[in-house]
Amino acid sequence: MGESSNVHEKSQAFYGPNLGYIIELYEQYLEDPSSVDEETRRYFDEFGAPETSTPTEVPVSGPSFDLEKVVSATRLINDIRAFGHKAADIYPLKDHPREQELFELSRYDLTEEDLKQIPARLLSDDAPKPNASALELFRHLLDVYTGTVAIELRHLDDMEEKKWIRRQVEQGALQQTFSKEEKIELFKRLAETELFESFLHKTYVGQKRFSIEGLDAMVPLLDAMVGGLISSGSEHINIGMAHRGRLNVLAHVLGKPYEMIFAEFQHAPNKELIPSEGSIGINFGWSGDVKYHLGLDRKVVEQQKEVRLNLANNPSHLEFVGSVVEGYTRAAQDDRSEKGSAVQHDDLAASILIHGDAAFPGQGIVAETLNMTNLTGYRTGGTVHVIANNTIGFTTDPNDSRSTRYASDIAKGYEIPVFHVNADDPEACVAVAKLISEYRAKFHKDILVDLIGYRRYGHNEMDEPMNTNPVLYKAIKGHQSVRHVYAARLEEEGVMTKDEKAQIEQKIEEALKAARDLVPSEEEDADIVLPDAVHKGFPKVDTSVEREFLTQLNEELLNWPEGFGVFHKLQKVLDRRRDAFSEGGKIDWGHAETLAFASILSDGTPVRLSGQDSERGTFAQRNIMLNDVESGKKFSPLHELSTAKASFSVYNSPLSEGSVLGFEYGYNVFAQDTLVLWEAQYGDFANSAQVMFDQFISAGRAKWGQKSGLVMLLPHGYEGQGPEHSSARMERYLTLAGEKNWTVANLSSAAQYFHILRRQAEMLGKEEIRPMIIMTPKSLLRHPLATSPVEAFTEESFKPIVEQPGLGENTEKVERLVFCTGKMAIDLAEAVGKSEESLDFLHIVRVEEIYPFPVREIRDVISRYPNAREIVWVQEEPKNMGAWTYIEPRLEAVTTNRLDVRYIGRRRRSSPAEGNPTAHKQEQARIIREALSRDVVSSGAGTSTYQKDRK
């Protein structure tokens, strides 16, 4: 590029010294054209005389203008681009003042005559036409930036993005010409949208539907977005949205038949209404959900290829579905068929997230999810965000729900371009949607549309908004719907007559009535019945691995490229893993996990692991991704495993629980063939993602038929580290346990961990699959009593319970059966090993799989001890926490109240653990002492000499 082009390019973005340099060259050219280089001379030759707005004005013989005026004009043009949104016509109700005075020429000490004298090309590369004046440019940019679309780009750092968007909009991308057929089709879409809502309103009086009315243009907007994304190569389009307008989007964007929606209003059977060709996938859970939470998975043929459209199931917890949808999309983009890390293909899938104007700035999960946009493990090649902005949140005005000008402002921190669009201009909405699809295809980055409309009725159809928002709703009642606004526009343009409008609307109403007539009159059966596979639970699975093969895997896991420098301390740790296969060797927790992953990959199952510090592991136990000490280059032996038939991906996550767990859940729901694991840094922090556990993971299948095999690793155990680094709050997951909705395990050996991971991988894709929560250890990671010999991996499988070796051998003498789980079992085992007293009066049983409760296995153990007088549950958590409240009634049921069931552990507390290490040690010692002490044996069923409940 020549010198003058560079100078001119700078003049567009800056004023002051750079522009002064241009003027200096120009004045030099005027005095002596030969004094500037040839290219610059040609450039100035093209200016000629500036065009005038009236034919009577006489053009001057050569360019002549005032430097100060050019500087002011440059500032004016830049300000229109940067701040035109403040003067834009983006509010359908006209209830926000337009700051049009910002661009009054007098504020810049300019007149129209001044602008006529300045060539537009001096101020912009994208002048409206050759030889245009600055006045024409000024008027053109006002049309572009202060019309029914407002654009915010000032916060973008990437100049290429800025310039591309500006060039597109200034060259007419938002002022597209629609053909007559396109305009009529657009009207038809608006009519379908509104008349659907009207039909529901009249037919199902008083039922909630969370109408789209006031934001009707969202439907053609989504139509155009979906079409644009498909044109860019997307084969999967995943949509997340809340309840507002959801039924309309289901009907018109996803193609859910009207009759199915009407059946849900009437509580009639609707399974037989699914199209016979199976193009619509609707999974029914056994307990179900309200109609405006349900999703849809539809395969369509568009542009001569099959495309999968998915609207994610959604709870009432606003915005949390966003990260779940991002997980869907990443799973659709990733190729997991080969060894190595999964290979991402951005163009294969795309996300559209529809937000509420109050929820977008109000819910922290939004920022968590936006933060993922450029992260290697979580990016999805550009998410399209749409704020369904009806300028109210239930009854709350914007000035009470956010501290910023726009609902979209939080997106600016992530350098996301923002388009504000007036929902009463459907053609502008469609034009923006097309431009956004092109942007996503080119830059693979997030982009946002703030679709500004209103809410025709209250928050729901039984709500009276005049009580809380009288001024707003007076304006809404007097405002025509976009269907009528656009129809009047088409009539004025001569595109459509009133009769043609009436015919279109009549056909739509007839279709709605015909669909209503298909709905059965009887109500559906309300019985809740679990599927047989869920009711029966997991079958017995052989998870052992042949010793020769396991040895081969171990050897390969200890190989890395020649010259790769492993940190010397880590080198010693890894070398010990080779010795574990020698006679008498033992395998620790981290080693067992790596072997499990290697064997699972060899079986052809992809593995994905993410969490805070998961490459190394919070406690330096994993080291599954190695870092060269000189170059920092990363290497994982699992990527080069010769027997691997699928991908292995591990990512250190951002410091977020909710969004990351939601992402991994979504990934697994979409890619049910993949073993997906999420690891909390400490189990204590998992409650930051409680919505994901409560609304999605524990209940998703019962509500929506949404299967998942997600594994959640929650470090848990009392080691004197205080109340925030001790408890994963096991009690919460057990409270949520029911209908075999997930597995809750607290393991005591490396081999058990190996086998339960392999069992989970084996069950992926089967009807019995369920999520799994593992209370993973901290101090046990390298504890000798938690290690396992090679034979435990090659000759055994997972055991729901494990009996303490060396105890309970004389069945006649056993009076006490001690049940415990996880670290408590190892603490007791350690004490048993050190004890010099006879412990033949007791036996210890480790409950490894707490839920589903291993009734048969525990009953078998109890039946072997005819003289047992009591069962004791021992835990390190307080009595109101941990497993006790879950375990007690189940143990009593197993014993049919024949034995006394009692508790040893910490008393009821409000905080889970002591902050004082000394106090912790004293409590831990007391628990162990009482568990192993003969002095507190129960005197018989229903009575106990044990001290009163330590309340």
Swiss-Prot record:
InterPro entries: 2-oxogl_dehyd_N, 2oxoglutarate_DH_E1, 2oxoglutarate_DH_E1_bac, DH_E1, KGD_C_sf, ODO-1/KGD_C, THDP-binding, Transketolase-like_Pyr-bd. One of its GO terms (molecular function) is oxoglutarate dehydrogenase (succinyl-transferring) activity. SUPFAM superfamilies: Thiamin diphosphate-binding fold (THDP-binding) (SSF52518). Pfam families: 2-oxogl_dehyd_N, E1_dh, OxoGdeHyase_C, Transket_pyr. Signal peptide: none annotated. Residues 906-925 are annotated as: Disordered. It is an enzyme of class 1 (oxidoreductase). Its cofactor is thiamine diphosphate. GO terms for biological process: glycolytic process; tricarboxylic acid cycle. Its EC number is 1.2.4.2. It comes from the Bacteria. CDD domains: TPP_E1_OGDC_like. Keywords: Glycolysis, Oxidoreductase, Thiamine pyrophosphate. GO terms for cellular component: cytosol; oxoglutarate dehydrogenase complex. Homodimer. Part of the 2-oxoglutarate dehydrogenase (OGDH) complex composed of E1 (2-oxoglutarate dehydrogenase), E2 (dihydrolipoamide succinyltransferase) and E3 (dihydrolipoamide dehydrogenase); the complex contains multiple copies of the three enzymatic components (E1, E2 and E3). E1 component of the 2-oxoglutarate dehydrogenase (OGDH) complex which catalyzes the decarboxylation of 2-oxoglutarate, the first step in the conversion of 2-oxoglutarate to succinyl-CoA and CO(2). This is 2-oxoglutarate dehydrogenase E1 component. The gene is odhA.
